[in-house]
């Protein structure tokens, strides 16, 4: 009888735990994806903060020339970063127990791999948690679809690109100036500005900003006034009210006359779908572009493509970009190789006896 009661109590405990995890009545929804999301994101955040403050220099290029990235080693908020894992490690899984000592693990940039892998797992679980909560509330799944765009972009620069290039040392550093360095080197090696998918991403981001500003300003300009002139117009809205808060007909008429009739949406639902889809599709294409360039399927190269009748080159802006790319590549990893790969016309001499 005692054994039966104990089993029933344990079943009730597990049932209560399951209900607590999956209930939508909590202040913050946890969900089964949240069970994995919380520890992974906490780990990534904690290690990032500690490493950004106190991590020793990392031998990123594997040539015994460590690069400093933490605040205690001379950096500030702008120049500081988590330095990517050393080229010596390549794509190997490099947890702390794989190193001979913690000092060796830090010298080879172990924290970067730890942070990136936990972060990617965490944001993927956050995406799953969005789907889980939408499902339990009976909502449509478009929130998780929209969030998949930044998740795809982060996965591209932190995981797909290092895999394609053969080393986590080619991943994006976790810092402000490190991000800019990554962008410059990426342009030098892959000519990303001339890649159609990057162009679509630029159109998505800037177009999304434009459409968001246009929509917000139109709505704000066509609010249905519910207050006096001495009160804020925002006081005329009550959360959950059934009435429209702005006049979509007036906004439609204004915008249609400002540009032309069919440039303005007359359906609020299709309008908001468009506002969500435009930047999401653009960022999807950017992530896809990064993933293809990871395997060196690079942007267009129109180098010296325009010549006159005598065969002389007429420089175009594409040639200016190519020249800038060579200059940036020369500055990159200046001690790891003497010349950019584009200028290395002959094979290196053999050094074997």
Curated annotation (Swiss-Prot):
Its EC number is 1.10.3.9. The record marks 161 as: Tyrosine radical intermediate. InterPro entries: D1/D2 (IPR055266), Photo_II_D1/D2_sf (IPR036854), Photo_RC_L/M (IPR000484), Photo_RC_L/M_CS (IPR055265), PSII_D1 (IPR005867). The record marks 190 as: Stabilizes free radical intermediate. GO terms for biological process: photosynthetic electron transport in photosystem II; response to herbicide. [CaMn4O5] cluster binds at residues 170, 189, 332-333, 342, 344. The chain crosses the membrane at residues 29-46, 118-133, 142-156, 197-218, 274-288. 2 of the reaction center chlorophylls (ChlD1 and ChlD2) are entirely coordinated by water. Herbicides such as atrazine, BNT, diuron or ioxynil bind in the Q(B) binding site and block subsequent electron transfer. PSII is composed of 1 copy each of membrane proteins PsbA, PsbB, PsbC, PsbD, PsbE, PsbF, PsbH, PsbI, PsbJ, PsbK, PsbL, PsbM, PsbT, PsbX, PsbY, PsbZ, Psb30/Ycf12, at least 3 peripheral proteins of the oxygen-evolving complex and a large number of cofactors. It forms dimeric complexes. This is Photosystem II protein D1. The lineage of its organism: Eukaryota, Viridiplantae, Streptophyta, Embryophyta, Tracheophyta. The gene is psbA.
